[in-house]
Each structure stands twice: as C-alpha cells, then as structure tokens.
Amino acid sequence: MAHSATAADLKPWRDPAAEPFIKIRNITKKFGDFTAVDNVSLDIFKGELFCLLGGSGCGKSTLLRMMSGFEKPSSGTIEIDGQDMSNVSPYHRPTNMMFQSYALFPHMSVEKNIAYGLLREGMSKPEAMEKVAAMLRLVKLEKFARRKPHQLSGGQRQRVALARSLVKKPKLLLLDEPLGALDKKLREETQFELINIQETLGVTFIVVTHDQEEAMTLSTRIGVMNEGEIVQIGEPTQIYERPASRFVADFIGSTNLIDMETDSTGRAVALG
C-alpha cells in the first residue's frame, strides 16, 4: 500500500515559499495585569504534529484555547486554512479539542460517546454508526463498542476520546496534555499509537505537553514556551542538539553546559 506523504516527510517549514496552514501573529492574552501569552507569532503547516512544550503556567494551554476559540486574544490574529478566526465561534471553527480528562459521558457506551456529536448535528443514525465503526477500527476498539467508560482501561478511554474528537473530521485537532493521565509505560505505548493515527488520517495535530520526552517522540517540530513567550521553535533534534538559550538547554535536559568567553582573537575559551 502506498504511503501518503505527511508534513513529517516533506518538512514544508524548511521551504520559505511554503504556505502555512496556521498563522499566528502577535497574539497576546492578558488576565487583568497578568500576561499569559506575550506577543507570540507562529506558523504551523498542514499535516504537522506540532508540540507546545513548557512548564506549568508558561501559557501553552492558553495559546491552545485561543486557537480553539475558548479564549479570546487580547490582541493579535489567528488564521486557520486561510480564514481569520477573530470572529468565529468555537463551534464553527474547523477544529476540535481533546482534553486531558477525556470528558466521556459515563452513562453512554463507547459507540454512543463517539456518535454523540454526529447525531447532535442531525446526521442519520445509519450514517453516523458507519463513521463510528470506521473510527473504532482505527483505534482498535471494535470489540469494546458496547462497553461503558468505567469498563475500560485508561489507555482505552484515551482512544475513545481521540476517536470522538476525530469522527467529525476536523482540519485541526488540539490536544491538551492528552497522555497526562496515563502511567509511564502506557504513555510510551500510546505515543506511537497517536503518531500512527495522525499519519493515517493526515490531520494536523497540536499537542500541549510539559513532558520533554513525549514532545521529542511525538512531534514534527516543537515550540518551547517560557513565561508566555515561545523561546525556540525547531525539529526535535535541533532543539536537543542546538538549544537557543540556557533555559531551553536546562528544560530539555541531558545537556552539559560549559561557561565560555571569547579571547582577544574572538575564539571561544572555556571558563574555570
């Protein structure tokens, strides 16, 4: 079977002529006197699995919520697939959002959870269930269609939430700490499932995480955030091998820092 080209294969961000799928320009979000996101500009390309990486309170989830429409920017613009989102409500954007809590309906079966959004929008039940069946195959949960969420493992619930987020075929899926509720072993297994699903569908994913290893494994590119700003954007190997600042080097970890100064000839000399 032919492999469909993804952003990971083509790396359009290396091409100055490539047109971004998402254009974020000078986005700022203030809550009173506190600036949560500070003048962020960012391009993301179609088919990417882009990670926003940073510690607690750095602004990454606020930036994600502004893309979804659940937070309104104080200033700046967000454009998705050529459309300015300034006056577009969350429910009319070509996006869907998956939360860390998964927010599954406990009284509904797996298949009814996935079908809920389709039926609510007026799709016929036979057509909706056909789409649900395709999603269940994709996330390998066909045998669990009639089970309730409490009868599933954490990893299975995560896949139900993912299927529900994708069944309406959004152009952009926003994932806020999607693996945060899983234990380490299950989180590592689920990372690769997430990559496979994203590449199969070709949907653009933006993932928020505080986990450096998760970002390095999942992403086509990473935007490292600190105090409301994006301090470095790059492919995982670039971020790891060439951190742009001491903060990035410390945050990514596994890096030896050597204090240097230049001598009179301009050569770098180690201190100490």
Label for each model-derived stretch:
Residues 76-84:
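Conserved ABC transporter NBD signature motif
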Residues 244-272:
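ATPase nucleotide-binding modules
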Residues 61-64, 160:
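ABC ATPase nucleotide-binding domain helices that frame the ATP-binding cleft
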Residues 88-247:
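ABC ATPase nucleotide-binding domains
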Residues 53-55:
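The feature captures the beta-strand-to-loop junction immediately N-terminal to the Walker
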Residues 68:
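Helix-to-loop junction immediately C-terminal to a conserved catalytic motif
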